[in-house]
Regions:
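Glycine-rich phosphate/cofactor-binding loops in nucleotide/flavin-utilizing enzymes
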Residues: 154-202
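A structural signal for short secondary-structure junctions
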Residues: 13-14, 144, 168-170
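Alpha-helical transition-metal enzyme core signature, strongest for iron centers
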Residues: 64-71, 101-111, 115, 139-147
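Glycine-rich cofactor-pocket loops
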Residues: 33-34, 38-58, 71-106, 116-134, ...
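A structural signal for short, well-ordered beta-strand segments
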Residues: 22, 118-119, 139
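Short segments within alpha-helical structural elements
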Residues: 148-153
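FAD-binding core of flavoproteins
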Residues: 1-72, 184-186, 192-202
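A general lysine-centric signal
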Residues: 136-138, 173
Length: 202
């Protein structure tokens, strides 16, 4: 067993991504998951997929944390210091930016409530496939929008690498990909709502 070269990524660089190669590696039958030839483990794949019901709320919570950090940073910069970056006025006095703050806060709160519900259902032994997928999809969308808007609100300073905003914006994108892409989570939710799934809505 060996690892190939570590990939250079857009974001989440503190976590390495690489391919693990199992060369001439024999796996004991008892360790095989999801093999259709082995009745004992034929449900293994479904079991692995079911873990997403637990991990998607965790990923959603992480995404919300990044979005919250970006919003708080911009608020502190503009409100406490009154940085004049657009139109010759302190940006916190501009109505357009007030609307931005309202929208960012509302979207983060909505994503957080979805995530709380998905986690609460998991903790109480309830099936949360629908809620976990909604929370993850919503949080991934929101963190991307919030971090991008945060960069815009600080103008050239926000785009510079001397602030953490550009890092948070890069880190945010992974939330559209891992633990199921946005399209996968949207498909899960849509099929449950439209009745394609054999399970009833929660």
């Amino acid at each position: 067993m060996y690892v190939t070269k570590v990939e250079k990524k857009l974001g989440i660089r503190a976590s390495d991504t690489a391919t693990i190669v199992f060369e001439d590696c024999r796996i004991p039958l008892d360790n095989i998951l999801g093999s259709p030839e082995v009745p004992k483990t034929s449900e293994g794949f479904k079991g692995v997929m079911a873990t997403f019901d637990a991990t998607r709320p965790i990923v959603a919570a992480s995404a919300i944390g990044v979005g919250r950090a970006a919003l708080d940073f911009v608020r502190e910069t503009l409100v406490q210091h009154g940085v004049p970056i657009r139109y010759g006025l302190p940006s916190h006095k501009l109505t357009a930016l007030e609307r931005d703050f309202m929208d960012m806060e509302a979207q983060l709160q909505a994503a957080r409530l979805l995530t709380w519900r998905a986690a609460w259902m998991m903790d109480n032994g309830m099936r949360n496939n629908l809620e976990a997928s909604m929370a993850k999809a919503k949080a991934g969308l929101v963190v991307t929008q919030v971090t991008q808007k945060a960069v815009e609100m600080l103008g050239p300073l926000g785009y510079s690498r001397q602030l953490l905003l550009e890092k948070w914006m890069r880190d945010a994108k992974i939330n559209d990909i891992f633990e199921g892409t946005q399209q996968i989570n949207q498909m899960i939710v849509a099929r449950r709502i439209l009745g394609y799934s054999s399970k009833e809505l929660s």
